[in-house]
Regions:
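Hydrophobic membrane-insertion alpha-helices, especially the h-region
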Residues: 1-10
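Extracytosolic low-complexity repeat regions of secreted or lipid-anchored proteins
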Residues: 166-174
Length: 196
C-alpha cells in the first residue's frame, strides 16, 4: 500500500510538474492579494496575504488554504515515519496557488495530513478569473516572486546570479530554509523554499 501511495503521490505529481516547466517561464503581474508587512526572520514565509511559519505543521495551515479531501481519504492506512507526499495547495476558490511536500516528521505512522508538516513550497503563477498572475510568495526582507536580481543580491550578496543569462536558477540559504530562485530576464518568476 505504501509503495502505491509513493508512486501516486510522488512520481505522478513530479512528472506532471516537469511538463509545465517551459510554459511557466513568464513574468506575470503580481496578484493583488499580498502580505503587507515585512518578514524579518528566517522561519516564516508569506503566500498571498498569509504569513506562515516554515516548516509549517498542516494543523496550522491558514484557513485561506487547503488541500484536496482525497489526500485525507487515501491516508486511512497511514503514512510511515519519514514518508511524504506532494500535492497542490489550493486557495479558498479551489485554485492551485502553490505546490507542497507534506512530510511525516513523527516517529510513528500517522493517519491524517494534519499530523504532518509542510517541508517544501514552490510557487510561480496561477489563473483566476481567466487571467494569469504571479503568486505573491516572499521570504525575509521582501525577497520573492517579482524581486529583481539586484534586490536579491542586496539580501544575499553571495548569490551567484549570471549577468547576461535570460534564464538562471540560483540557490541560497536563509537560516533553516533552502531557497531556490528561478530568474527570467533577471526577475524571480518562481521560488521554492525547503527545510533541511
Amino acid at each position: 500500500m505504501v509503495c502505491c501511495l509513493t508512486v501516486f503521490f510522488v512520481v505522478v505529481p513530479l512528472f506532471n510538474r516537469g511538463q509545465d516547466e517551459d510554459t511557466e517561464a513568464v513574468i506575470y503581474p503580481l496578484f493583488g492579494q499580498q502580505y503587507s508587512d515585512m518578514i524579518t526572520d528566517t522561519n516564516h514565509v508569506a503566500l498571498l496575504d498569509q504569513k506562515m511559519e516554515f516548516p509549517l505543521p498542516m494543523k496550522d495551515l491558514p484557513d485561506a488554504f487547503h488541500i484536496e479531501k482525497r489526500y485525507y481519504d487515501d491516508m486511512t492506512d497511514g503514512i510511515d515515519a519519514g514518508d511524504s507526499f506532494q500535492c497542490e495547495l489550493l486557495n479558498d476558490s479551489d485554485e492551485p496557488v502553490a505546490y507542497i511536500k507534506v512530510t511525516n516528521q513523527k516517529k510513528n505512522t500517522v493517519q491524517s495530513p494534519d499530523d504532518m508538516v509542510i517541508t517544501y513550497i514552490v510557487a510561480s503563477s496561477f489563473q483566476t478569473q481567466d487571467k494569469q498572475y504571479a503568486v505573491p510568495f516572499v521570504i525575509r526582507d521582501g525577497i520573492g516572486i517579482g524581486s529583481t536580481a539586484e534586490e536579491v543580491k542586496q539580501i544575499f550578496p553571495d548569490a551567484d546570479i549570471p549577468e547576461n543569462d535570460n534564464y538562471s536558477v540560483v540557490n541560497v540559504d536563509s537560516g533553516i530554509q533552502k531557497i531556490t530562485l528561478e530568474f527570467v530576464d533577471r526577475t524571480v518568476y518562481k521560488m521554492a523554499v525547503s527545510s533541511y
